[in-house]
């Protein structure tokens, strides 16, 4: 998912101490899985265009706080349900928040409504797919930084920036961004392009040559290295 695919929508990633509203989107996580209900569970949902869907599960959608509160039959007032929610980002004037089942008092979610992050590859519309993918990345960062990597003490969330702070030794951890390159190798005479297929992993589709930039390496250097490693083992496919 590329950020330009959410146009004409605008993405606002800056950190905010913002309180949620019932109409804001909630990404409710159980570990690394996210809660995505279906429209058939909520007969009151009328705006299916905003709810999105997945090609093989077209009725699955990204819910708001109000919808989650009603669907799961949560008895506590909405104001209390808002507690322990993390503001993630906004797209246009809609805010997105993260909450975990642990934060919600060991809330039990229906197993059939829990999905791995790969579900957002085929999510529609694309700006909500982008939101889901970005939210799962932040969720993974929080899960991986529950404890300090230096002294092992439990970390806390910063109140001034998106970071995990160790109150014991002062170590600060930020979300990691891994620079990568994607290269289109084209044979203009044959009107073909070089595509690869991964030997392992869950993604089995054809893809362009790509790879991560190593420490101290330039983007051009990474592109050359990836081309050398792939060009003898890949196939040329017609465009």
Can you name each region flagged by the protein language model?
Residues 132, 136-182:
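Acidic, metal-coordinating catalytic segment for phosphate/diphosphate chemistry
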Residues 164-208, 212-213:
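N-terminal strand-loop-strand
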Residues 217-218:
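Surface-exposed, charge/polar-rich loops and edge strands
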């Amino acid at each position: 998912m590329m950020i330009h695919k959410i146009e004409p929508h605008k993405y606002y990633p800056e950190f905010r101490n913002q309180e949620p509203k019932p109409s804001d989107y909630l990404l409710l996580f159980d570990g690394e899985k996210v809660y995505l209900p279906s429209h058939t569970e909520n007969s009151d949902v009328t705006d299916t265009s905003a709810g999105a869907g997945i090609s093989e599960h077209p009725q699955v959608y990204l819910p708001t706080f109000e919808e989650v509160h009603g669907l799961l039959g949560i008895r506590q007032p909405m104001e209390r349900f808002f507690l322990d929610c993390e503001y993630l980002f906004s797209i246009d004037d809609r805010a997105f928040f993260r909450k975990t089942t642990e934060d919600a008092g060991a809330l039990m979610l229906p197993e059939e409504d829990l999905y791995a992050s790969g579900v957002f590859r085929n999510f529609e519309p694309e700006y909500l797919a982008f939101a889901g993918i970005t939210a799962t990345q932040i969720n993974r960062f929080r899960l991986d930084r529950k404890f300090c990597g230096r002294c092992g003490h439990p970390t806390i969330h910063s109140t001034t920036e998106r970071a995990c702070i160790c109150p014991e030794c002062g170590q600060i951890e930020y979300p990691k961004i891994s620079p990568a390159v994607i290269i289109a190798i084209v044979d203009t005479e044959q009107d073909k392009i070089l595509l690869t297929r991964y030997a392992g992993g869950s993604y089995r589709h054809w893809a362009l040559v790509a790879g991560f930039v190593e420490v101290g390496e330039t983007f051009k250097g990474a592109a050359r290295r990836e081309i050398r490693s792939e060009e003898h083992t890949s196939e040329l496919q017609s465009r």
